[in-house]
Every structure is written in structure tokens, then in C-alpha cells.
């Protein structure tokens, strides 16, 4: 397994403390990797800063060609990436191969094209005797912090727009799941000029803090928890760095009486539990209207109970383990607290799976109330709550009564209602009669404490640029 860092175009061993990397399906140590030292963090940022003077002025075509080469290389090594991701995250291998790797490749190819299609206000004489034009230039050195739930995909979401726009990047994957990012570093080394892309390994306090706080870093992009986002915003405030934050969610799934109940059941079974529920857009907070609620509890409970947990390499496995022992304990605690309330009914699941690895049973909790922590706080596991509602106004108020604002869905056959709800839900994305669908052409990002800034789409590309006005007197 590739365990070296990429700094200034060279693969080097970390000079810091060694950290274990686990297989969450077994709890066994896969390998130990040495963190970047403080000197190596500094070297990576300064290499990126030096490279920016040239990379930032390359043509969009040249940058696009590099991204297309990287996409091709990932596609050629798809099985290697999939196996690393499966081993390091516990994801079912067939899901990584069929869903995640193609999506990663598509993101790089999309931004390769988007780099050549930026547009803006037309140049013109908005003041007599003066011609104005708008430039959209790269920001500079971007520090990117990727999460542990989709390590390779989130790295792609950060690298592709930043590099396409002409920035240079120093990326730190999660210390829990670094293997695919380090493999990516090995393959990208000969595609990009030295210093354009740098990949580090280490914990937040030893590598993340000196990276995000570095004087030469002009922008920090994070996908992570609210707590981590708060820390980075505070840590970088004195240097007024641009920040780009995607900080989690608690997606409401609003099911009206006229919804296609079978479609809802299939949707929640799939999109509430994909990646063991470790997804900030997971369909985890169901509000069902009183007419459909009892039947939905029964049907969904039966469907969720059929989800198969198991070894990631088994093609019949649908639900892998949680990412770490610590996260398994957090999920156990959240469910135990809900059960202790008395009014929450465990329809199915509700406890960890005995044996090796960090597995938790697919869980459906009915009877949850709006004020319950299981409704209000992100669990980030295979746990879905159900709450009964009366009418449109009540459920709209409840859905928006959340610190999160990333994703939501509405299930109804009434087109007018779908439009009304979509217009008033305070979420970065609202799906109607589906959930979890993402495409490279459309933006993904949150509101409220779910953060700000967009991933994917031309809006994501624009987030990694600065707008400049040039006026010429004549």
C-alpha cells in the first residue's frame, strides 16, 4: 500500500509520529503511516505557492488536459482504488466499483470541461471613455481537508474545481481513511507540475492546524463536522482566509398521504442506509403524514430488516461497518438515549452487531418527537427516525426547525404542493419523489450550520476563483 506523502512533485516518507490505519470490517491494523512533520507541512505549502505563479497562468486547455489524464488514470486503476477504499472504509466493494469510482472519474472530466467555459459580464464602456472588463482569477494556495466517509470522492470534489480554476492545492485526507488519497498522489505525481498538487497525512492538531493556518494559504476547503468547521473558521480568522464549508446535515424526508408508499420504502431503504448511513444527505429524518404513517412504519420496518450487513468483499453485502470504534460508540449512545425516552419504538435494529468490526444494525425508530435529540442531531449511522405530522404547515415548520440545511426531500403526487414545499424548505437541495441523487452539473452545498460554498457544477468552480475588475481609460 502506498504510504508516502506528495510534496513538491516527490513522494517522501512522513517525518512525524506514526499513526495506525484500521480495517473497520475487522478492527485490525492495515498499516502504520508517519505523519507529516511541521517542516514538511511548510514545505508543501511553499511548494504550492511557488508553483502557483506559473500554474495560475496556464491556459484552461492545459489545466483541462491534466485533469483528463488524471481521470483516465483513476479509471485505469479503478479496481485498485475500489479495493483500497473498501478495505479502509469497510464499504461494500461492489458499491465502490459501480457507484463511487465512476462518479469520481466524472467529476474530474466535468471540471476539465468547465475550466474552458467560464463566463461573466460582457466587457464594455459602462463609464464614458473607460472600458471595463471582468477577470475571474484563481485564489492561490488552497488547503483542502477531506472527510472519512467518502475519501476519494470528496478529494475529487475538492481537487477538481480548485485545480481547474488554476489554484495549487495541499490536501489532507482524514487520518482514518488516507489510503486512496495517497494512491492518488502516486499516480498524479507525473501528471501535474511539481508543487501544483501536494498530499499530506496526519491528524488535525499536528498537520491540519499548521496547514490551514499557514500564511501562504489563501483558502481553506473543508468537508467535516460542525465542530471542525467552527475550529477552522476561528483558527483562520486572524488571517482573513476564504473558507468553503460543507458541515453535515440531518435531511428531512417529508412523506404526504398521497405519496407512492412503495417508492418511499425503496428510497429510504436505499438512501437512508447507503454507506452505513455515514452520509450528510442520508434520508434519516422521516416525517410521515398521519394517514400514511402506520402503513409506512410497517412496510419500511420490514424492508430495513432485510438489509444485509457483512464482509465488504461479499457481493450480497449492503451495509458495511462504521468508520471506527469511536464512531460506533457514538452511534450506540445516540440510539440508547432515544430508546431511554420511552416513547420511541425500535421497529428493527437498535444495537451493534456482535463479533469483529464496527458494525451496527440497520435501525428504524418510530414515534420520535420533534424535540428529541434523535430528530435534532446528526447520528451519521444506519439509523432512521420517524415522526407523524398533521398538515403541510406543521411539517414545514418542523423540517426547518433544525440547525442543519443541507438536503431534504418531499414525497407527493401533488405538483403544486411539491413546488410550495420546495420554495420554503431551508435546504441547499430539495428532491421530489427521490433522494440522494447527485450529478456533476448541479451544485451541492448547505445553508445554516451545514455551511456555505458549493461543490460540483460551475458554481463550485466559481467558488475557487476571485472576481477582479479591470478598467482602462482611453
From Swiss-Prot:
The keyword NAD applies. Its EC number is 1.2.1.19, 1.2.1.-. It catalyses: 4-aminobutanal + NAD(+) + H2O = 4-aminobutanoate + NADH + 2 H(+); 5-aminopentanal + NAD(+) + H2O = 5-aminopentanoate + NADH + 2 H(+). One of its GO terms (biological process) is putrescine catabolic process. It is an enzyme of class 1 (oxidoreductase). It comes from the Bacteria. Keywords: NAD, Oxidoreductase. GO terms for molecular function: aminobutyraldehyde dehydrogenase (NAD+) activity; NAD binding. The active site is at residues 246, 280. InterPro entries: Ald_DH/histidinol_DH, Ald_DH_C, Ald_DH_CS_GLU, Ald_DH_N, Aldehyde_DH_dom, Aminobutyraldehyde_DH, PatD. Pathway: Amine and polyamine degradation; putrescine degradation; 4-aminobutanoate from 4-aminobutanal: step 1/1; Amino-acid degradation. Coiled coil: none annotated. 4-aminobutanal can spontaneously cyclize to 1-pyrroline, and 5-aminopentanal to 1-piperideine. HAMAP family: Aldedh_Prr. Homotetramer. This is Gamma-aminobutyraldehyde dehydrogenase. It comes from Enterobacter sp. (strain 638).
